[in-house]
Curated annotation (Swiss-Prot):
Organism in which the protein naturally occurs: Debaryomyces hansenii (strain ATCC 36239 / CBS 767 / BCRC 21394 / JCM 1990 / NBRC 0083 / IGC 2968)
Residue ranges that the Swiss-Prot or TrEMBL entry lists as coiled coil: 186-479
Subunit structure: Component of the NDC80 complex, which consists of NDC80, NUF2, SPC24 and SPC25.
Family: Belongs to the NUF2 family.
Record-linked Pfam families: Nuf2 (PF03800), Nuf2_DHR10-like (PF18595)
Name of protein: Probable kinetochore protein NUF2
CC annotations in GO: Ndc80 complex; nucleus
Gene encoding the protein: NUF2
Region annotated Disordered, chain positions: 96-115
Function: Acts as a component of the essential kinetochore-associated NDC80 complex, which is required for chromosome segregation and spindle checkpoint activity.
One example of a Gene Ontology biological process annotation: kinetochore organization
InterPro entries, per database record: Kinetochore_Nuf2_N, Nuf2_DHR10-like, Nuf2_N_sf
Subcellular location per the Swiss-Prot or TrEMBL entry: Nucleus; Chromosome, Centromere, Kinetochore
Length: 488
């Protein structure tokens, strides 16, 4: 990424005069003052006034690092937040366990939420430090730590930002040559991604087709086995159904006989009850003759006892028959219930038979569909072979592109190394020339001091000479005046 051209101005004497030329031995870049760092970073649209740079806070360093990573590394704040979310998803099982503990201990819910916030902020801080460490390592600073973010020191921040400014200037100087290589590399990467995506898509398609073929073969085998089992089960049910029909016919005849016998016995019981009532009436009539004719009464009693014994015998027979009939009725009811269950089972069997016929129709359709799928599979196999050949050709192209890219990258690295060596040589020559210039300035200042001293001595001698000349003139004038007086 090219930076604004104002960051590097070789002819700007105001920036050069403010630069501090003392270099830390382990660093390969000059240490700049806070004012120059602020101007250079602001020219790159970073928030960096002199007060913030000279008195950095933790929050400002975090904001500045996010801006630097977004501009130079392409790692935005949204990317960092996405990484934090991925880390939180990986800890989801632990979070569920903690949630279960929170349900058992609800009084710890607030502290758990605070712990989650602390974990999120800590993960974000670690990811920010990793990205910044990688960037500063490229710039030449290999000792960037978390304390530089949490408790920044002005001198360390000054050194780190000096490395950033130096890196930005170097990129600005070589941006024209690097942009071509970057564009070529990006194009190669895009082609590589497209080919890889196509490769993965074809692989997934091949796997899906293999899975469908195996599933169809497995389903067909299961359907054949299930059909045989259903046929065997249906034949058994048909035999049982025939037996049940015969039993039903026999039980129906017995049930009709039972009904006739029951009706006959009920009629006979009614007749006996009627006879008992009539006998009771006759007994009431005979009571009046009890005392008048004991012999007749005795005979009647004997006859009645005989009739009673016969009636009791008949009654016992009827009761036993009644019990037997009740048991038969209950057994018939059970049989009838079983018949109803059997009819219901028969209906289910018939439904199963209809379903079986439907399944057979579907099976025929599936077999036809399978044949079509086999034809389609053959076509797909041919297509897969074609795609495989294309994939091999593409892989060869990718290898050639990678080889070309590596060669170009190696050439660009060599060129960058030579440019960096030239830059270091120029910096050293500039330092030597500046030292010579300082020596010349000191020599000139000494000469000016000597000239000023000589000038002052010359002025003093000049004034003394002028005074001597004035005295001499006055003596000459006085002498001439006296000589004129003597001549006159």
């Amino acid at each position: 990424m090219s930076r604004p051209s104002s960051i590097y101005r070789p002819g700007n004497s105001s920036l050069t005069s403010r630069r501090i030329h003392h270099v830390i031995p382990q660093d390969s870049f000059p240490l700049l003052d806070f004012k120059e760092i602020s101007i250079c970073l602001q020219s790159c649209d970073f928030i960096a006034n002199e007060e913030l740079v000279s008195r950095p806070t933790s929050q400002y360093i975090k904001t500045l690092l996010e801006q630097l990573l977004d501009s130079f590394m392409g790692l935005s704040a949204d990317n960092i937040n996405g990484m934090v979310r991925n880390v939180n998803k990986n800890d989801l099982s632990m979070t569920k366990t903690q949630d279960a503990q929170m349900e058992e201990e609800p009084e710890n819910g607030g502290s758990q939420i605070e712990d989650d916030d602390d974990i999120t902020s800590s993960v974000r801080l670690i990811l920010l430090h990793r990205g910044a460490y990688e960037f500063f390592s490229i710039c030449g600073v290999n000792d960037f730590t978390l304390m530089d973010i949490m408790r920044p020191e002005p001198q360390r921040i000054r050194r780190i930002l000096s490395a950033v400014v130096n890196y930005a200037r170097f990129r600005e100087e070589n941006s024209v040559e690097c942009e071509k290589l970057v564009s070529i590399s990006e194009g190669n990467l895009e082609q590589l991604k497209v080919v890889q995506n196509e490769n993965s898509r074809l692989s997934n398609k091949i796997n899906d087709l293999k899975y469908k073929i195996e599933a169809n073969e497995t389903d067909e085998g299961n359907k054949k086995a299930t059909l045989k089992q259903i046929t065997t089960y249906n034949s058994k049910l048909e035999n049982e159904l025939k037996k049940l029909k015969k039993n039903q016919e026999i039980l129906t005849l017995e049930h009709s006989k039972y009904k006739d016998e029951k009706r006959r016995l009920i009629e006979k019981l009614e007749d006996h009850n009627y006879l008992i009532m009539e006998s009771n009436k006759e007994l009431d009539k005979l009571k009046s003759y009890l005392l008048s004719n004991p012999e007749i009464l005795t005979k009647i009693i004997e006859d009645l006892k005989t009739n009673l014994s016969e009636y009791q015998t008949n009654l016992a027979d009827l009761e036993s028959k009644n019990k037997n009939m009740t048991i038969s009725i209950e057994s018939f009811q059970l049989v009838e219930q079983e018949l109803k269950n059997l009819f219901r089972i028969l209906e289910e069997v018939l439904n199963d038979l209809t379903k079986e016929e439907t399944s057979l129709d579907k099976l025929n359709k599936y077999q036809e569909f399978k044949e079509q799928q086999n034809l389609t599979l053959n076509d797909l196999n041919r297509q897969i072979q074609q795609v495989t050949r294309q994939l091999n050709n593409t892989e060869e192209k990718i290898k050639r592109l990678r080889h070309q890219s590596s060669e170009r990258s190696e050439a660009s690295k060599q060129k960058l190394i030579s440019l960096k060596d030239g830059y270091d040589t120029l910096v050293k020559e500039r330092k030597v020339k500046e030292q010579e210039l300082n020596k010349k300035k000191d020599f000139i200042s000494e000469l000016e001091t000597k000239m000023n001293g000589e000038r002052s001595n010359f002025q003093i001698e000049l004034r003394n000479a002028e005074l001597a000349v004035a005295k001499l003139n006055s003596h000459v004038k006085l002498y001439l005046t006296e000589m004129n007086k003597k001549v006159d």
